[in-house]
């Protein structure tokens, strides 16, 4: 889901860059729509992290608790993804999308077990 949002953000960045410099009304309208699309999908990434992973799935671990380091690592990855999604809203630099995909992959590897990762891969193929 987040990977699809990031792919859409990257496509929007490409379209905005392609239309840059044009001043006719239709091009300006298309740019506005692509900016809205880009920002909407970046917001989707942030909301998925906040409302699903941080609020529901990632359980807080106190210092000394088993699994504390994994909790810290996952929380840091999610924070990085929230920040890079924000930066995607502010720019058309596609390297931000590449960074976001890398963070998603790192989080996926940390969050899911081997069975879950295999299931995700099978969904992408099918």
Where in the sequence are the language-model features?
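Mature extracytoplasmic or organellar-lumen-exposed domains after removal of signal/transit peptides
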Residues: 1-25, 31-126
């Amino acid at each position: 889901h987040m990977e699809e949002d990031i792919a859409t953000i990257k496509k929007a960045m490409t379209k905005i860059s392609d239309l840059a410099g044009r001043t006719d009304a239709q091009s300006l309208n298309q740019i506005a729509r692509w900016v809205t699309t880009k920002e909407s999908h970046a917001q989707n990434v942030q909301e998925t992290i906040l409302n699903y992973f941080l609020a529901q799935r990632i359980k807080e671990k106190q210092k000394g608790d088993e699994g504390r380091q994994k909790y810290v690592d996952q929380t840091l990855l999610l924070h990085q993804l929230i920040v890079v999604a924000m930066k995607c809203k502010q720019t058309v630099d596609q390297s931000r999308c590449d960074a976001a995909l890398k963070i998603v992959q790192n989080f996926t590897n940390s969050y899911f077990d081997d069975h879950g990762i295999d299931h995700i891969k099978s969904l992408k193929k099918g």
